[in-house]
């Protein structure tokens, strides 16, 4: 066969280019790579060196946050679909290829944070981050600081991803090289009330600070229920296996797992430590007022020799195995103990109640994360979702929905977290919200959510098809549909229309504790919200002379991101925390005259004010929660 005849035959070796392009959004990057290696036809069609379509789709998958409500579904009123990040990067780097844009986002985007310092929530403390300068810290004295008032880079992995800047050797396959570096490439950052959640390109999930809950209950077990805790059970069983010593003088008991000022107790197993000649297990040992041991009433032996009593030094650490297991579940970023990796309970067979392979580990990979006030929700590569919602554990709980269709036919398309509840959009089911779940019992691998289905949100093609949704508190959900002419609110089992005097078709919404942001195809508006009730009189068009494409809100402050990669902030900076990122408090009030004191340490900035980044720096993603703000920032070369 001639070369010409061969080329003519090649299209018969696979699907047409249009069909392949249409299927790319439904394939993982590994699937696409494998498909490209199937034969010459697919290898040419999916050319990793020259295909714009391929790298554009790979960019969406890696950095588009398509599985959370950070980005809306593509609606009838949407133009060509673009994520916020790609809009900014195409504006800033119009001449780069999609492969170059992908590599720029992967290697040059660094995580910056600012705001309240308490509990290391920013990913660092005042003394642990070398990037901090004195003028960036708010506080009454050099030794006592409240917060960080300017965007500051967070200490992250210090390996070749820091210096590589997307330069590959001629022999390297760029996608494979990026995959190798995936553990250190930040794909998404989400902010809760007391921490940031950081998702890497490889699917690892991290959380900043010492607590994501702040000691507050999230949408976890109902009432006073508690999840099964294997660590607590192991400790209880270990301590029970040691005998207790009863004093004849006052009848008090002492657990022998404590430390004694004497010889280490004899025997290598707790059940034989006080048994002469391997007798049956001693349950109680009685000590008279002089300290001499005597047989416990009803005991099987007449006395315990004095040599079996501890007489010097503490016994061996009976908790060593538990401590080893806990250490395996607490992995920090190298060189930064203020950012820890987060795992699901299902990663550890220990939680199943089985004794075998206690140290084994199942590495679950996540593709999306969304944060609430004291909890967060993540989705894995198999379309399972996990909720970190308890003050008692740092491990996520797998969530299931009783009496709903299988994920195989009705997958979860997006996840979201409100102030005190979780929500997701399930194909042909609609919006599903819950603020409680069952407690996990021993041997169980998941918990059932106590959910509500938002009525009339299951349409997948028509006018009522959901385009975007936003979560407030107590299962209150705002949403918009394909028509784009109405804002809907679901609360207490009912859907209501919120009538507003706005211009344009609604295409995107954002909400937090006390605010609601509406995007139309021509304008951007803000509204105040109190206990789910919209203050219609507070409707305000954003006064920013740039096109705003993303907005994030904390408790009382808001940050906007424009298509040019600029940041603007306004609202209340509580307790001198620095969350607005506009500099020292005195400068905001006395020099720039853009804010006013409210009380002793609160500052209000009414008009959106530009956050000054270093020259040639742009922001590609912003998040906020509580009293802190975070952003992914790139230096333009």
From Swiss-Prot:
UniProt keywords, alphabetically: Phosphoprotein, Repeat, Ubl conjugation pathway
Signal peptide extent: none
Biased composition (Low complexity): 289-305
The RCC1 repeat ranges on this chain: 109-202, 565-635
Compositionally biased intervals (Polar residues): 244-260
Pathway membership: Protein modification; protein ubiquitination
GO BP annotations listed: protein ubiquitination; SCF-dependent proteasomal ubiquitin-dependent protein catabolic process; ubiquitin-dependent protein catabolic process
Keyword Phosphoprotein recorded: yes
Keyword Heme: no
Residues annotated with Phosphoserine modification: 16, 266
Gene Ontology, cellular component aspect: cytoplasm; SCF ubiquitin ligase complex
Region of interest (Disordered), ranges: 242-315
Impact reported for residue 372 to V: In saf1-1; impairs the protein stability
A Pfam family: RCC1_2
Domain F-box as annotated: residue spans: 14-63
Role summary: Substrate recognition component of a SCF (SKP1-CUL1-F-box protein) E3 ubiquitin-protein ligase complex which mediates the ubiquitination and subsequent proteasomal degradation of target proteins. Targets AAH1 adenine deaminase for proteasome-dependent degradation upon entry into quiescence. Targets also URA7.
Description of how the protein assembles with itself and partners: Interacts with AAH1, SKP1 and CDC53. Component of the SCF(SAF1) complex containing CDC53, SKP1, HRT1 and SAF1.
Name the UniProt record assigns to this protein: SCF-associated factor 1
Source organism of the structure: Saccharomyces cerevisiae (strain ATCC 204508 / S288c) (Baker's yeast)
Lineage: Eukaryota, Fungi, Dikarya, Ascomycota, Saccharomycotina
The gene coding this protein: SAF1
